[in-house]
Amino acid sequence: MLIMVTGVSGSGKSEYAEQISCQLAKDNKKYYVATMYPYGEEGRSRVKKHKLQRDGKGFETIEQYQNIGGALKGCKRDTKPVVLVECMSNLLANECFEENGHPDNIFAECMQLYSECSHLVIVTNEVFSDGCEYDDSTTDYIRRLGELNVKLAKAADTVVEVVYTIPVVLKGDISYVGN
């Protein structure tokens, strides 16, 4: 199953995506694919917060800042794992603004990763409603994220927007997620 979880910063989407991943994995292997470079104090603080949030949930962390399709390369697997990717906005920024980036390959690489898992949970951000105008490179990034999110939503079995920690189903079903 391919599940996309979206929401604004601080909405609770990460914790919800972890809950879904744990429910789906049961006793199966779970990987948390971290895509954010921990730049500066804010970045390090966010990484620390997410690590504490995952503590004790059985995730093995993979840091994969680009080329998401290769995230499981080198991982020993007896069965197909559950994979949680956190998050598309960071991955896209890395592919757009870092050396040797390939932003146009992200969707295909996500589908490659999906073919290697039993379930893929992808977290993305809702950054489209602030009403601000930006420079050309930021506008291009926001456009690309929108296009990527549309492709992922079309491919996904389930799409959930988390609003103030409340999951709102936009597509599919979440009855498999316990309270």
Regions found by a protein language model. Name each.
Residues M1-L2, D78-T79, D173-N179:
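Short, Lys/Arg-enriched, disordered terminal segments
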Residues N28-Y31, P81, H119, T158:
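Residues at the starts of beta-strands that form the adenosine-phosphate
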Residues A17, H50, L84, N125, ...:
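Residue-level signal for inorganic ion chemistry
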Residues K57-N105:
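Helix-adjacent hinge/juxtasegments
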Residues M4, V82-L84, V121-V123:
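Structural motif
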Residues L2-C75:
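Conserved P-loop
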